[in-house]
């Protein structure tokens, strides 16, 4: 299924319904930085949303809620992931700003340069809205 067709709301809701409290969501990314090589692991601490047509909230009808995403990922879970990766001797990037694009196409060179100039380190197609939807349902997410 292409990333822009994933029903993120249904997936996150289902996880909440079965009692999940914490989500570790690995994803494939492209690097926008030369020091982030294939095989390295980047633990995002920020994201930039460049998607267009995704259902990105549970609060689009009735109740209105404004959820803070200033720090979108759980610091404790991030630290656990960083520690585990270091124990396994992986090349870990402890901070990364990840830009999420709509897909299914990859970015152009011009877009990648723009994202790099914005401070993005990695690029993918599935981080958003998953991380925000999880936060709306009080699920811990990285």
Question: For the regions a protein language model found, what residue spans apply to each?
Answer:
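General beta-strand structural signal in soluble alpha/beta enzymes
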Residues: 23-27, 43, 92-95, 99, ...
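Non-catalytic positions within long, well-ordered alpha-helices that form the structural scaffold/packing
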Residues: 16-17, 116, 135
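Metabolite-binding pocket within alpha/beta catalytic cores that recognizes anionic/polar moieties
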Residues: 1-70
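A structural signal for small-residue-enriched, beta-sheet-centric alpha/beta enzyme cores
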Residues: 127-136
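Conserved small/polar residues in nucleotide/adenosyl-binding loops
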Residues: 140-142
């Amino acid at each position: 299924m292409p990333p822009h067709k994933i029903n993120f709301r249904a997936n996150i809701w289902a996880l909440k319904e079965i009692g999940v409290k914490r989500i570790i969501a690995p994803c494939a990314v492209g690097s926008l930085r030369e020091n982030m090589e294939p095989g390295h692991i980047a633990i995002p601490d920020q994201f930039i949303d460049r998607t267009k047509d995704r259902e990105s909230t549970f609060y689009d009808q009735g109740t209105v809620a404004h959820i803070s995403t200033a720090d979108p990922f759980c610091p404790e879970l991030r630290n656990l992931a960083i520690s585990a990766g270091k124990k396994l001797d992986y090349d870990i990037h402890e901070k990364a700003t990840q830009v999420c694009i709509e897909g299914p196409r990859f970015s152009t060179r011009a877009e990648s340069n723009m994202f790099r100039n914005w401070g993005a380190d990695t690029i993918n197609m599935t981080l958003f809205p998953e991380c925000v939807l999880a936060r709306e349902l009080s699920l811990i997410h990285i």
